[in-house]
Amino acid sequence: MGYSYTEKKRIRKDFGKRPQVMEKPYLLSIQLDSFKRFIEVDLTGEVGLEAAFNSIFPIASYSGTSELQYVSYRLGEPVFDVKECQIRGVTYSASLRVKLRLVIYDRDAPAGTVKDIREQEVYMGEMPLMTENGTFVINGTERVIVSQLHRSPGVFFDHDKGKTHSSGKVLYNARVIPYRGSWLDFEFDPKDNLFVRIDRRRKLPATIMLRALEYSTQEILAIFYDTTKFDIKDGVISMSLIADRLRGEMALFDIAANGKIYVEQGKRITARHIKQLEKDNINTLDVPVEYIAEKDLVVAKDYISKETGEIIVSANDILTLEILAELTQSGITSFDIIYTNELDCGSFISDTLRVDSSSNRLEALVEIYRMMRPGEPPTKDAAEGLFHNLFFAEERYELSKVGRMKFNRRVGIDGDEGAGILSKDDILSVMKTLIAIRNGDGIVDDIDHLGNRRIRCVGEMAENQFRVGLVRVERAVRERLSLGDLDATMPQDLINAKPISAAVKEFFGSSQLSQFMDQNNPLSEVTHKRRISALGPGGLTRERAGFEVRDVHPTHYGRLCPIETPEGPNIGLINSLATFSRTNSYGFLETPYRKVENGKPTDQVEYLSAIEEGSFVIAQASASIDENGLLDEELIPCRHKGESTFLSPADIDYMDVSPQQIISVAASLIPFLEHDDANRALMGSNMQRQAVPTLRADKPLVGTGIERRLAIDSGVTIIAKRSGVIDYVDASRIVVKVDDNELLPGEAGIDIYNLTKYTRSNQNTCINQKPTCEPGEPIVRGDVLADGPSTDMGDLALGQNMKIAFMPWNGYNFEDSILISERVSQEDRFTTIHIQEFSCVARETKLGSEEISADIPNVGEAALSKLDESGIVYVGAEVKPGDILVGKVTPKGETQLTPEEKLLRAIFGEKASDVKDSSLRVAASTYATVIDVQVFTRDGVEKDKRALEIEEMQLKAAKKDLTEKFKILENAIYEKALAILVGAGQDEARLLQMPRAQWLEVQIDDETKQSYLDQIITQYDEVKADYDKEFDIKRRKITQGDDLAPGVQKIVKVYLAVRRRLQPGDKMAGRHGNKGVISNIVPVEDMPHDEFGVPVDIVLNPLGVPSRMNIGQVLETHLGLAAKGVGEKLERMIKYQRDIEITKVREFVQKLYSFGDAPCHVDLNDFDDEAVMRLAKNLYKGLPVATPAFDGANEGEIRELLRMADLPESGQLQLTDGRTGIQFERPVTVGYMYMLKLNHLVDDKMHARSTGSYSLVTQQPLGGKAQFGGQRFGEMEVWALEAYGAAYTLQEMLTVKSDDVNGRTKMYKNIVDGDHRMEPGMPESFNVLLKEIRSLSINIELDESN
C-alpha cells in the first residue's frame, strides 16, 4: 500500500499474518446513521419524523366536517454552533417547522366536497441535533444516547422449566409481543387446559378468545381436530379406519375383518399390524358397544332430532350409550367423533371448552371486558369497542415490520409482509403452533438468541418519543376542530407545540439511556457511543435480570463483545458492539463473513444476522489457505447452529473476515489478548477507558494496529478534508492550500482548521489540540493534521511506555503495589492537567437581588487581593482552599438589633449588616490557577466592567480571527489574479509595484483570461461580503444579553486548572488487567539498574502474574524491550557513526519491517533518502509494532527482534541494586510495558475532617468527602476498642467526637484555651432512642436523680 507524506513519518511494524479482507467500518456509524435516518426527509414515510407525522395525521374532527393534514416538514439552522452552546450552557438544536393543511368540508353539499383549504407552516418546538461525532449538546453538556437491546416484537414460545407446579410438569406458553399495544399470552395449566391472558391480567379459558372472534364450538373443534366417522347399520356400529392412527394403542377388542383376526384384545398395535391392515385394504372396523362405553368419545358436531327439532347431542359432548340409543332412535345413521390420543394429539381445546362458561360471542366479550375493566358495568358497545381496540385497531396496536416478519416466520405464514394488526388467522396460528409444541412437534424459542433481541438506536427512540408528544397534541387538536367556528382559524391556532417539545426534551435530558458522555479519553468516548444496554424503558431491570440474560450466547459471535462488560451489578446487561458489527434494516445485529465457494474463500463479503447464520457452516478466520487460495486442511474447525464441529472444506459456506471480529474496539487494543485470562482482559478493556490523558502523549511501542483508526474515528484529532499543502501553522489554526484538482468552481481554495485549546471535558480532564504538521508539507485527504488529547502523531496514546522490572523490592510491591522511580515524576511522564468549572449565580430574591461585587462585609483586604473591582478573580491568579473566586452578597431579612449594633450602624452607615457574604470560594484541597472567566448577564441588566472587558476581548479575538481568515483568502485570490495577468503578458515587476487592489482593475485583451479575472473579482466581492456578514453575526452573538433561567440576573463561570503529578496513592494499570496503587516514589539512584547503569522506571511484583493468568503482560514486556532496543541501536548507528551511509540505515530499517512470518507492507524503495532519515529518527524512541489480537507476534519473532537489538533472547537482564551496588542473584525480566494512569487520583479521594456539619436528627457528623464528613466508627470498631479495654478512648468516640452536642462545643472551647480536658455528656442518639420508643406508645423516662 502507498503511504502519504504524513504517514511516512512513522510506520508501525505489523505482525499480523492474515490478509485484510475488508476495512474496519466507521466506528460511530451506529449513532450517526440512525439519527440521520430519523432527521432526513424520507419520502417513503416509513422511518423518522415523516413516519411519526404520518401515523398521527390527518386528524379529523369528531363530526368529520374538518381535518388537519400533514404536508411536509423542515429543520431550520441552529442559532449557535456546538462550541458556543457548550460555553453558554444551551442545547444545540434547530427549530422544527411543519407545513400543515386545514381542510374544511361543506356540511350541506354531498360528502367529501371541500369548502375551504388553508395551508400554513407551524413551529413545533426545537429538535436537538447530533454533532458530527455522534453526541448531543443538552444544556451545554455533551450527552450520548446509548442504544438499547430489547426483546424483538413477534411471537415467542416458551415453557416454565417445570418451576410453576409442584409436580414439576412442564407448562408451555406463547406470547405475542407487539411494538406497541397489548401483550397476548396463551398458556397451559397443570390440567392441560389452554388459557389466555391479555396484558398479564387474570387468565381466561383460551376458547373465550375464539368465541369473541365469532367461532362456534363446532367450528372450533373443526379447526383443531380431525374426525373419525362412525356408522350405525342394523344395530352394528362400525368406524372408518385410518390405520396409522392406531399405532402404539392397546387393542380394547379383537381387531378383525373378513373373518381374519389382525390383533388380539389386550395386545399393543405395532407398525407390522398397521402394514398388514393397509395391505389388505381394511377401511372399516366393527366396534363392540363396550368400546363406546369405555372410551370417552367426544362428538364433533351438533346432532338434531329430525322429528322434534331438538338437539340430541351438542358438539364437544361425551358420547354415552344413552345418547347413542337416542341417535339410533331418531334415525341418524352416522356421526363424527373428534380424533385425540395421549401421544401426539391431545384433547386440550376440547377440555378447555368444558371449563369455558361462555356460550356465544356476547358472553365472551363481556367476560373479556370484566377482566380488563373490573367493576365497570359492561354494555354491548363498550365490550365490542374494547375488544376491537385491543388487537384490531391500527392506532392502538402495531406489530411493526419486524414484528410481522418474526411472527410470520415463526408460525409458518408465507412472506415477511403483512398488516400491523392481528387477524383471526394470526391468533389461530399461534394457538395451533403452541398446541403442536405441547404435542411434541416443534421446539420452544431461545429468548437470549440475538435473532430474538434487537437494537433500538437513537433515531428510533427519538421517533417514539416524538410520537408520544404528537399523540398528546392530537387530542387537543381534535377537541379544537370540534368546537365549531373554524372560519378564521389557521393551523397555527390549533397546534400547541409545548407537549411535543416537552416530550423530546424529557427524552434527551432525563431518559435512562441519555447519558453524560464518558469523556476521559478518545477510547472512552468511542466505547460509550458503541455501548448496547439491556436496561432502560421497555428493557430489563437489574434486579430481575437472571443469569441467562447476562451470559455470553453463541450468537454474540461477531456481534457483541464477549469480553467488554462492566464488573458489578450490570455485568452482561451492558455490552459493547463488536468491531465489524452493524444493525440491519430490522434492527438485528449482523456481522460480515467471506463467502466460500467449493472450498475456496472469495473476496465477496456478506453480512449475516443471527437468524440467517444458523443455517450455514462458518470457518474461523485462522483457517489455513494454500498458495492457490484453497482451504488446505482435511478437517476444518467451524461453527454450525451454534455448535463447534470439524468439517471438510467442501461443506463450508462462509469464513470469518478477521480474527478480531468477535471482540470490541477496547478489547482489540490489548496486545497478546490471546494469552490473557478472560476475566483480566475484561478489567484491561474497562480500565483503558479510565486512563487520563497525559501532558505529553506517548504512542504505545507494542500496539495492535487499531490505534490510528480509533484516534481518527473518535473525532478528537483534526483530519484533512482535502489534499493540498500546509500554508500556515500556529497553535490555534492550520491553513491548507487545496490542490487544484479538488477545488470547487469559484472557490478560493483555502481550508482553515481551528484547533480546540485547553477546554474542559465532562470528566474535568483537559482537551487540547496540537498541530503535527509543518508549513510546506504536502498532505492528502484523511491525514492527521493535529493531535488531540491522548493521541500521538495520529495514534491513540492512553499512557506511557515505561521500563519495568518484575522483582520484589523491600516489600514495596506487596499486594499489587507499584514502586516507581522519581525520574518518572520529574520528567512529567504521568503529569495530567485537570480543569474544573465553578459557577456563581446571582439571583433575584424576595428581599432584593443578589449582587456580585468586591464590597463584601467582614472580609479583610488580603482575601480580596485576587479580585478585580467587579468582584471576580483575575485570570492567571493562583488560588488555594478558601480563597474567594467571585464575591457575592445576598440581602438578609431585617433582624432585631441590639443597642450597640444600632449605635455602630448610626456611625458607620447602613451597608454592613443588611447583606450576608455568599461568595464562591475554592473547595478544600484545591490548589489551582484561574485560566478563564465567563460572565453571562441577563438581557436588560447592565453589564459590569469585567463583563464588558471580556466582551471586548472576545470581539477582538473574533475580528482578528476573521481578518486573518479574510487575509488568507485575499492573498490566495490576489495570487490567482497575478498569475492570470502575468500569463496575459503583463509585466510582473510593474504589477508588484502597484497596490494589489489595482490588479483587479487592469483590463486585458485575451477574452478568456479576462472572464477568469472577472470571476476572481466576483469571488473577491463574495469573500468580502462574507467577511462583513460573519463579523456582524459574531458581534451580535457576543454583545447580545444571555437567555438565563427565570430569576437569574447574572452567572459567572470560573475555570481552574490543576496540574497533578504522579504520587503515592494514585492508581495505575497496564492493559492486561494488571492494576495497582503506587506505594512509594524512590530516588533514581536507589532503583535497580542494568550493566550500563540505566535504572528501571517501575518495579512490579512477579507474583501478580501466575495466579492472574494474564501472561500477555510478560510477552508485551519482552516485545517492548526488543522494540526499544532496535530503536536505540538505530540511534547509535546514526548519531555515533557520523559518516554512515544512508544505504546502511535503509537496509537496517527495511530489515526491521521485513522480518517475521507476516507479509511485509513497507517497501523503502518508494521512500527518498530524506524520508528514510525522517522515519529512522522517529524510530529512536523505539520501533512501534502491531500485534493484533489472535493473530499477533509469536515467540520466534520476539526472539528474532531481540537478536536484532543485540539483547539476550531470554528477555532477562542482570540488574544491580541501586542502594548497595550488589548484583541481584539471578537475571530479572526487564522490558517496556505500556502503563496507564487511571482517573482514581489520591488528590480526589484523600480527605481529613476537623469539625464540620452534623446530621439533623442524630447530630452525628456527616459522611463523605463532598460533605466534609468524618470517618465512620461502626459497631465492629467499638468491639475492637472494647476488646483492648480502651474505655476512655471509647467514651470519647461515642460522645464528644460524635453526638454529645454540649460536650463537643465545650471541648472545642477548652482546646482553644489550651485546656485538654473533656466532660462527656448525654449522646443525642440516646434522646433519639427515647423518642422512637415513645412513638411506639411506650412511655420511657430517664431518671437522673442519683
UniProtKB/Swiss-Prot annotation:
Keyword Nucleotidyltransferase in annotation: yes
Xref: Pfam families: RNA_pol_Rpb2_1, RNA_pol_Rpb2_2, RNA_pol_Rpb2_3, RNA_pol_Rpb2_45, RNA_pol_Rpb2_6, RNA_pol_Rpb2_7
Catalytic activity: RNA(n) + a ribonucleoside 5'-triphosphate = RNA(n+1) + diphosphate
Keyword line: DNA-directed RNA polymerase, Nucleotidyltransferase, Transcription, Transferase
Listed GO biological process terms: DNA-templated transcription
Keyword Transferase assigned: yes
EC number of the protein: 2.7.7.6
InterPro entries recorded: DNA-dir_RNA_pol_bsu_ext_1_sf, DNA-dir_RNA_pol_bsu_external_1, DNA-dir_RNA_pol_su2, DNA-dir_RNAP_su2_dom, DNA-dir_RNAP_su2_hyb_sf, RNA_pol_bsu_bac, RNA_pol_bsu_CS, RNA_pol_bsu_protrusion
Domain of life assignment: Bacteria
One Gene Ontology cellular component: DNA-directed RNA polymerase complex
A molecular function (GO) term: DNA binding
Function: DNA-dependent RNA polymerase catalyzes the transcription of DNA into RNA using the four ribonucleoside triphosphates as substrates.
The family this protein is said to belong to: Belongs to the RNA polymerase beta chain family.
Subunit structure as annotated in this protein's UniProt entry: The RNAP catalytic core consists of 2 alpha, 1 beta, 1 beta' and 1 omega subunit. When a sigma factor is associated with the core the holoenzyme is formed, which can initiate transcription.
Annotated protein name in UniProt: DNA-directed RNA polymerase subunit beta
